[in-house]
Amino acid sequence: MATTTAAAASGIFGIRIQDPRPGTGRVQARFGFSFGKKKPAPPPKKSRQVQDDGDRLVWFPGANPPEWLDGSMIGDRGFDPFGLGKPAEYLQYDFDGLDQNLAKNVAGDIIGIIQESSEIKPTPFQPYTEVFGIQRFRECELIHGRWAMLGTLGAIAVEALTGIAWQDAGKVELVEGSSYLGQPLPFSLTTLIWIEVLVVGYIEFQRNSELDPEKRIYPGGYFDPLGLAADPEKLDTLKLAEIKHSRLAMVAFLIFALQAAFTGKGPVSFLATFNN
């Protein structure tokens, strides 16, 4: 009876039923409601070979990388001191007793632990199996790193050309009005902020509509005008170089922020003071 009912429900609610203990008659159900038409999942990417020899580069000499950082990701140096990238584990329960002929129905026991597969399975609502999984963290690392590279270069260039530290640039805009390369702009600072919010927000909405994890972080096309990624043999080298520069830029901008907070100087003026 229970099997027949579960089979009928599977066609309505999209339940996947499997037998966790063959021969015991127990069943397990995982509910997956779907709204609208699902996009087909992208073809699986060819996984990189895991570096399992003793010559693997790690973030600190002699450090032991955690098991979930196996070297398969580009730029993986085994650094995860807080275990943020550890795969989530879920308890697997048996069905509660629902026999109307019994005086008492007992709750289902814990029959095991489920760990999500490392294989990425996009859905219409999210591109990753785990919202806070290691693939999601890699995407965030790259995007923050790209912003940090732009910010670091901008902070140095602006101070070198104008003599105004990056943390004081907003004050100048409030006093003298908005300008670009010395030329006044016909917009107030508030208008410029709204323009930035709308433009960046639109770009982020478009990026988040992409379900292919590879295209989310490496879109190509207009973002590769020189066609540097056209050569598959050089692609991994370029990805490694980008993640290295991203990490360096994030550390550099953190130093810029601490420097501004404690000394009130920008990177160029602080370097000049240090040299003197």
UniProtKB/Swiss-Prot annotation:
Biased composition of type Basic residues is found at 36-48
Query: How does the protein associate with the membrane?
Result: Multi-pass membrane protein
Presence of keyword Transit peptide:
yes
Molecular function terms in GO for this entry? Answer: chlorophyll binding; metal ion binding
- The transit peptide is at 1-29
Residue sites binding chlorophyll a 1 per the record:
79, 141, 247
Q: Give the residues the record marks as binding chlorophyll b 1.
A: 59
Q: Which residues bind chlorophyll b 4?
A: 207
UniProt binding sites for chlorophyll a 5: 259
Domain of life of the organism in this record? Eukaryota
Coarse class of the protein's main subcellular location = plastid
Q: Quick one: which residues bind chlorophyll b 3? A: 204
Cofactor binding note: Binds at least 14 chlorophylls (8 Chl-a and 6 Chl-b) and carotenoids such as lutein and neoxanthin.
Binding annotation for chlorophyll a 3: 181, 242
Residues annotated to bind chlorophyll a 2: 144
A Gene Ontology biological process in which this protein takes part is: photosynthesis, light harvesting
The membrane spanning regions, by residue number, are 147-167, 185-205, 248-268
Please provide the record's keywords in A-Z order: Chlorophyll, Chloroplast, Chromophore, Magnesium, Membrane, Metal-binding, Phosphoprotein, Photosynthesis, Photosystem I, Photosystem II, Plastid, Thylakoid, Transit peptide, Transmembrane, Transmembrane helix
Q: How is it modified after translation?
A: Photoregulated by reversible phosphorylation of its threonine residues.
Q: Where in the cell is it found?
A: Plastid, Chloroplast thylakoid membrane
Q: How does it assemble?
A: The LHC complex consists of chlorophyll a-b binding proteins.
Primary role: The light-harvesting complex (LHC) functions as a light receptor, it captures and delivers excitation energy to photosystems with which it is closely associated.
Family to which this protein belongs: Belongs to the light-harvesting chlorophyll a/b-binding (LHC) protein family.
Question: Could you identify this protein by its name?
Answer: Chlorophyll a-b binding protein CP29.3, chloroplastic
Organism from which the protein derives: Arabidopsis thaliana (Mouse-ear cress)
Q: What's the gene?
A: LHCB4.3
